[in-house]
C-alpha cells in the first residue's frame, strides 16, 4: 500500500431516497485508483443497518431492486451503524490517500456528498472540497460527442 496525494477515492452510496433530510444511507462502497485510473484497491462494501421504519421510505422501484439484489436482507442483518461504517471506511482510506487530497469521485456525487455531510461528516471532511463527477463527463460527451457517447452507452448496456 502506498499513500499518495495523487491517488483518487471513488465512492458510491445507496440510499433509501434522494432527500438527506428524510432518507438514510443503506450502503457505502469505495475504491482507490491511481491518477491514471488504475484500480489499486477495493475498499469495504458495507450494508448499514436501518430499521423497517426507515426502509419504508423507499419508493417501490428502489425496494424491488434492493430486495432482488439482496441488499435489503444485508441491511436487516447488518451490525454496522452509519458511524461504524464511517470509521471502517476512513481506516481503509488512510492507507492509500492523505486527508484533504483526493476530490470526491463518483457518479452524481453531489447527492452522495450531501448524505455524507449529514450522516458521516468526518468522512465528508476527509475529501478535498473538489469533486470528479462522472455524470458531468457523460453529459458533456452527450452534448459534444454524441456518436462516441452512444457507442460507449451501447458497450455498457451489452456488458450488463
From Swiss-Prot:
The keyword Nuclease applies. Its EC number is 3.1.15.-. The active site is at 129. It comes from the Bacteria. Residues 8-158 form the Exonuclease domain. Keywords: Cytoplasm, Exonuclease, Hydrolase, Nuclease. SMART domains: EXOIII. The keyword Nuclease applies. 3'-to-5' exoribonuclease specific for small oligoribonucleotides. This is Oligoribonuclease. It comes from Buchnera aphidicola subsp. Baizongia pistaciae (strain Bp). The lineage of its organism: Bacteria, Pseudomonadati, Pseudomonadota, Gammaproteobacteria, Enterobacterales.
Amino acid at each position: 500500500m502506498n499513500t499518495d496525494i495523487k491517488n483518487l477515492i471513488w465512492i458510491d452510496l445507496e440510499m433509501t431516497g434522494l432527500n438527506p433530510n428524510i432518507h438514510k444511507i443503506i450502503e457505502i462502497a469505495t475504491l482507490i485508483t491511481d491518477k491514471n485510473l488504475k484500480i489499486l484497491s477495493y475498499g469495504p462494501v458495507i450494508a448499514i443497518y436501518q430499521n423497517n421504519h426507515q426502509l419504508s421510505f423507499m419508493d417501490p422501484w428502489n425496494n424491488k431492486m434492493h430486495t432482488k439484489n439482496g441488499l435489503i436482507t444485508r441491511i436487516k442483518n447488518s451490525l454496522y451503524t452509519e458511524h461504524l461504517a464511517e470509521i471502517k471506511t476512513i481506516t481503509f482510506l488512510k492507507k492509500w490517500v492523505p486527508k484533504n487530497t483526493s476530490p470526491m469521485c463518483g457518479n452524481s456525487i453531489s447527492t452522495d456528498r450531501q448524505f455524507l455531510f449529514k450522516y458521516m461528516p468526518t468522512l465528508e471532511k476527509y475529501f478535498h472540497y473538489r469533486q470528479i463527477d462522472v455524470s458531468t463527463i457523460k453529459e458533456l460527451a452527450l452534448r459534444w460527442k454524441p456518436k462516441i457517447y452512444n457507442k460507449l452507452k451501447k458497450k455498457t448496456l451489452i456488458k450488463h
